[in-house]
């Protein structure tokens, strides 16, 4: 089956479900992935997704139950900024905002939605903590969904069981979604999105603890991701990065299948043997007693978690969740360095020395001299373009980074001064 035939068949949903469209080989799958991973168009839209850990202020060692959290959300009216609310495997709450016309509109909408969600949870005796990793509680899954049950089983059967459980239930992030932009600029744009990763991780690192202990890392969240299978969670770029669609296709076909959904029952089960998707699509292995379909391929792509993921747009996935005082400035900085063409050109030079320093950024952050210099250069570029509404947040971030301080340092200081429980409770009550 050619790509054109496969795509046409997959789009005829009135006559045939995509589950019925079998992919004949890995070449067709690769073409399907590469051709659909980014969409040609102008820059400008920004979408934000923000996760926060849900705690009980009266007992921060307790993990609120699925029933407690969902009862609040069931009574929640539509949010003013249009965000959709969901619950992560460990009970973290996520706000997923719609695409907005520009970064300022996206920040404003998310700020309004956060305020409504916080108020609703507070009325139920619960609170939100914006940290990259849960500093207090052991990993426990509370979301009963079949996808997360299968994901848990997959990680338990692999060498990444411990970090997999931590990733699912004990981490929280800010995700920034941006237009892919004009096709002729895709390669440079995707390369820069990756190259900015270590510097932005160092700026926003906010997870010095996990499960009641200091980890020795500024971004324990990023460390957790680094401990997992690089075939699923590592950067997607090939040697040159000149062809992001081809790189993404190779990455996706090499990655092992995590779970399979039955087209008849929609039951989801974990794949506990190591089966690269290419083996399934080429018929070397049958899963669920059959060959792979378009629906299987589309679902497989949702189980891959690189730091920059193409989904027609770009998902930037490497930022720790950070407090209100700085997250608007962090988001503005990243968006400006990617979407403003002059700022992007300057950023390429600023981050080139540390473009692959992912582990160093997560471990010691701004204590690394090269990351410190890159971070200050990037913030200077963004600060020259900051709108009036964000001057205060940007100045706080600039001052912090100039002193070599990230949010993880602030949280660590509060833990040392008053204990973990007090520091967590303080964040629910507004301490930054």
Curated annotation (Swiss-Prot):
Pfam families: GCS2. InterPro entries: EgtA_Actinobacteria, GCL_bact_plant, GCS2, Gln_synth/guanido_kin_cat_dom. Its EC number is 6.3.2.2. It catalyses: L-cysteine + L-glutamate + ATP = gamma-L-glutamyl-L-cysteine + ADP + phosphate + H(+). GO terms for cellular component: plasma membrane. Catalyzes the synthesis of gamma-glutamylcysteine (gamma-GC). This compound is used as substrate for the biosynthesis of the low-molecular thiol compound ergothioneine. This is Glutamate--cysteine ligase EgtA. It comes from Mycobacterium tuberculosis (strain ATCC 25618 / H37Rv).
């Amino acid at each position: 089956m050619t790509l054109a035939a496969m795509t046409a068949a997959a789009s005829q949903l009135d006559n045939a479900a995509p589950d019925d469209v079998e992919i004949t080989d890995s070449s067709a799958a690769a073409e399907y992935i590469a051709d659909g991973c980014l969409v040609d168009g102008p820059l400008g839209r920004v979408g934000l997704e923000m996760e926060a850990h849900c705690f009980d202020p009266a007992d921060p060692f307790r993990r609120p139950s699925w029933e407690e959290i969902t009862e609040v959300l069931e009574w929640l009216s539509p949010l003013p900024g249009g965000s959709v609310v969901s619950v992560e495997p460990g009970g973290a709450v996520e706000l997923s905002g719609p695409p907005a016309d520009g970064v300022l509109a996206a920040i404003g909408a998310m700020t309004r939605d956060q305020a409504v969600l916080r108020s609703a949870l507070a009325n139920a005796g619960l609170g939100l903590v914006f940290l990259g990793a849960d500093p207090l509680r052991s990993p426990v899954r509370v979301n009963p969904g079949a996808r997360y049950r299968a994901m848990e089983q997959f990680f338990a059967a692999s060498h990444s069981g411990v970090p997999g459980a931590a990733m699912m239930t004990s981490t929280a992030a800010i995700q920034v979604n941006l237009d892919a932009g004009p096709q002729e600029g895709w390669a440079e744009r995707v390369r820069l999105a990756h190259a900015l990763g270590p510097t932005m991780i160092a700026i926003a690192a906010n997870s010095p603890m996990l499960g009641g202990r200091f980890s020795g890392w500024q971004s324990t969240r990023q460390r957790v991701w680094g401990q997992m299978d690089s075939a699923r969670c590592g950067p997607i770029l090939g040697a040159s990065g000149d062809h992001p669609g081809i790189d993404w296709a190779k990455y996706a076909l090499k990655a092992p299948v995590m779970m399979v959904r039955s087209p008849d029952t929609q039951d989801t089960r974990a794949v506990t043997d190591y089966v690269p998707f290419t083996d399934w699509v080429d018929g070397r292995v049958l899963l669920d007693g059959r060959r792979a379909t378009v629906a299987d391929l589309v679902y497989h792509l949702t189980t891959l978690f690189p730091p920059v993921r193409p989904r027609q747009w770009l998902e930037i996935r490497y930022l720790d969740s950070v407090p209100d005082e700085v997250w608007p400035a962090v988001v503005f900085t990243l968006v400006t360095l990617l979407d403003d063409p002059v700022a992007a050109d300057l950023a390429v030079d600023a981050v080139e020395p540390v473009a692959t320093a992912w582990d160093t950024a997560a471990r010691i952050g701004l204590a690394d001299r090269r990351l410190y210099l890159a971070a200050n250069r990037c913030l200077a570029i963004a600060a020259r373009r900051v709108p009036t509404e964000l001057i205060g947040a940007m100045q706080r971030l600039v001052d912090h980074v100039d002193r070599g301080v990230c949010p993880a340092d602030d949280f660590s200081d509060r833990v040392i001064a008053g204990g973990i429980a007090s520091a967590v409770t303080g964040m629910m009550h507004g301490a930054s």
